[in-house]
Structures are given as C-alpha cells and as structure tokens.
C-alpha cells in the first residue's frame, strides 16, 4: 500500500517535472526539462535514466524512467542522483549478455 501512496505522490508532483518534447533546428524532437523534482525518488521504482544536456534546453537534467513508465526530471548535481545513476548502470551491465 505504501508503494501506491508514493507512486500517487510522484504522479501528482511529476506533472510539472516531466520532460517536454521540443523541435530542434533540423525538426528532430528534443527532450528538455524545465523544472526538476526536489525530493528523492525511491530507487526500487526506477528502471533507467537519460542525461539531458542539449544546448537548446534551458537546464541540464537527468530524466529517470520508472518501472510504471513515468518520466521524472531531477537535478544532476544532487548526490543521490549520481549514486542512483551508478547503480542503474551496474544493473544494466549485469543484464546485458
């Protein structure tokens, strides 16, 4: 039951911190974050991440993908974010053949 409460809170908070698709000069879609989530996300709900550092975006960010398919923008300078990225990298290396 706790996990559902956490996910509901994340969903309500994620609306303003989910990545936006913009169109670049070559008409290719560009993912940008305009706001970042301030609270720590439980590692157990995360599946993967993507770094956002496109020059067309207003801020550098990391987008975490949850196991439920949500995308959440977070501040890459926070210590827990870099720790989670390392853990997710290790998990993905173990899963690759």
Swiss-Prot record:
Keyword Ion transport: no
SUPFAM superfamilies: Interleukin 8-like chemokines
Disulfide bonds: 32-57, 33-73
Listed GO MF terms: chemokine activity; heparin binding; phospholipase activator activity; protein kinase activity
Entry's Gene Ontology BP terms: calcium ion transport; cell-cell signaling; exocytosis; immune response; inflammatory response; intracellular calcium ion homeostasis; negative regulation by host of viral genome replication; positive regulation of myoblast differentiation
Keyword line: Chemotaxis, Cytokine, Disulfide bond, Heparin-binding, Inflammatory response, Secreted, Signal
GO cellular component term, pick one: extracellular space
PROSITE patterns assigned: SMALL_CYTOKINES_CC
Subcellular location as annotated: Secreted
InterPro entries linked to this entry: Chemokine_b/g/d, Chemokine_CC_CS, Chemokine_IL8-like_dom, Interleukin_8-like_sf
Residues annotated as signal peptide: 1-23
Main location, first listed in the record: secreted
Assembly behavior: Monomer or homodimer; in equilibrium.
Family note: Belongs to the intercrine beta (chemokine CC) family.
Biological role stated in the UniProt entry: Chemotactic factor that attracts monocytes. This protein can bind heparin.
Record protein name field: C-C motif chemokine 8
Lineage of producing organism: Eukaryota, Metazoa, Chordata, Craniata, Vertebrata
């Amino acid at each position: 039951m706790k996990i559902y409460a956490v996910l509901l809170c994340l969903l309500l908070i994620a609306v303003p911190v989910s990545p936006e698709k913009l169109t670049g000069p070559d008409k290719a879609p560009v993912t940008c974050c305009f706001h970042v989530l301030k609270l720590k996300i439980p590692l157990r709900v995360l599946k993967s991440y993507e770094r956002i550092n496109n020059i067309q975006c207003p801020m550098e960010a990391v987008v975490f993908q949850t196991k439920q398919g949500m995308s959440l923008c977070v501040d890459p300078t926070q210590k827990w974010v870099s720790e989670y990225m390392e853990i997710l990298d290790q998990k993905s290396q173990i899963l690759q053949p």
